[in-house]
Amino acid sequence: MVKISCNKVLSNHSGSVTVVKYNSDGGYCLSGSSDKSIKLYNVSKGSMIHSFEEHGYGIGDLVSTSDNKQLFSCAEKQLYQWDIASGQVIRRFQNAHNDTITSVCVNLDSTLLFSGSSDRLVKAWDLRTKSINPVQILDDAKDTITSIIVNEQTITHNHSHGHGHSHGNNNNNQPHTHTQKEVITSSVDGCIRTYDVRMGTLVTYEDTIPISSVSITKDKKCFIASCTDETVKLIDIDSYETLKEYKGHKNKVYKINSCSNFDDSLIISGSEDNDFYIYELLSGKLLSKLSGHSNIITHVDSHPSKNQFITSSTDCTIRIWDQSE
């Protein structure tokens, strides 16, 4: 049995905390709030390092780059790129969308930024140029985009079984690798859409229940979808079969997210009943329902290499939860 308890409460925001995310190694976390600020914390110390205060509206989403040097954030129709060390805005994408921007995501090498909006569009921005226009627009969703993931992994094809003919060399025994790049979106229209950037294809998981967020397991084999029928669904990434449903938390109105822990043994979820829910991934069993927040838990995130979690709430606080020894 995994015992989890809250060991730190961060109370630096003066408004609802809409999002909280670890940086790539889990040493720091970033939060966004309706108070229009983004805050950077040292997780182990529980201390705030910096407050980013250039947005004119409440923060909808944020993401840091894999090298932890830059930050992207959205607020209403504003899309900003920040230098984390200096706290300065590097670039403003003014009026990037025609409606509120709900989600942002950046690829691994920080060359492409993706933004999703209530205008139903996903836009891709080339960070290597100063162009004010997106390089691509994905317009397949029928309703608000609720989350975006970039899934990049190296696929190895082993040709040692003698497929094809050898043309005077022996290279067909060498494994061939390519990087699969997928952009995955969820929407209020009940669909998860997977775009293969390399192949230019789209595959759609369709349901009638609005999806308030989608994440991906650490082994990249399953989607984790938070749905407004108060379920979290574990969906096979290849067959789109629903493998497991997790029930107990409350989610009918708000954008609430879920994700797996570092080793894919647990599923964690926010909830509208103010409690933090932890499920066993394989069995679907509810392991823990943790109290502490005094209002809706809007966002949860899992440390990349241990059982530590962060939660944000409309009670204006962030809580850090650790596994008890």
Swiss-Prot record:
<dbReference type="InterPro" id="IPR019775">
    <property type="entry name" value="WD40_repeat_CS"/>
</dbReference>
<dbReference type="Pfam" id="PF00400">
    <property type="entry name" value="WD40"/>
</dbReference>
<dbReference type="InterPro" id="IPR001680">
    <property type="entry name" value="WD40_rpt"/>
</dbReference>
<dbReference type="GO" id="GO:0000398">
    <property type="term" value="P:mRNA splicing, via spliceosome"/>
</dbReference>
<feature type="repeat" description="WD 6">
    <location>
        <begin position="248"/>
        <end position="291"/>
    </location>
</feature>
<dbReference type="InterPro" id="IPR036322">
    <property type="entry name" value="WD40_repeat_dom_sf"/>
</dbReference>
<comment type="function">
    <text>Molecular scaffold protein for various multimeric protein complexes. Acts as a module in the assembly of a multicomponent scaffold for the ERK pathway, linking ERK responses to specific agonists. Also involved in response to hypoxia.</text>
</comment>
<feature type="repeat" description="WD 2">
    <location>
        <begin position="54"/>
        <end position="94"/>
    </location>
</feature>
<feature type="repeat" description="WD 1">
    <location>
        <begin position="12"/>
        <end position="51"/>
    </location>
</feature>
<keyword id="KW-0677">Repeat</keyword>
<dbReference type="InterPro" id="IPR015943">
    <property type="entry name" value="WD40/YVTN_repeat-like_dom_sf"/>
</dbReference>
<feature type="region of interest" description="Disordered">
    <location>
        <begin position="157"/>
        <end position="179"/>
    </location>
</feature>
<keyword id="KW-0853">WD repeat</keyword>
<dbReference type="GO" id="GO:0005737">
    <property type="term" value="C:cytoplasm"/>
</dbReference>
<feature type="repeat" description="WD 3">
    <location>
        <begin position="96"/>
        <end position="135"/>
    </location>
</feature>
<feature type="repeat" description="WD 4">
    <location>
        <begin position="166"/>
        <end position="205"/>
    </location>
</feature>
<feature type="repeat" description="WD 5">
    <location>
        <begin position="206"/>
        <end position="245"/>
    </location>
</feature>
<comment type="similarity">
    <text>Belongs to the WD repeat MORG1 family.</text>
</comment>
<feature type="repeat" description="WD 7">
    <location>
        <begin position="292"/>
        <end position="325"/>
    </location>
</feature>
<dbReference type="InterPro" id="IPR020472">
    <property type="entry name" value="G-protein_beta_WD-40_rep"/>
</dbReference>
<protein>
    <recommendedName>
        <fullName>WD repeat domain-containing protein 83 homolog</fullName>
    </recommendedName>
</protein>
<dbReference type="GO" id="GO:0071013">
    <property type="term" value="C:catalytic step 2 spliceosome"/>
</dbReference>
<keyword id="KW-0963">Cytoplasm</keyword>
<dbReference type="InterPro" id="IPR051980">
    <property type="entry name" value="WD_repeat_MORG1"/>
</dbReference>
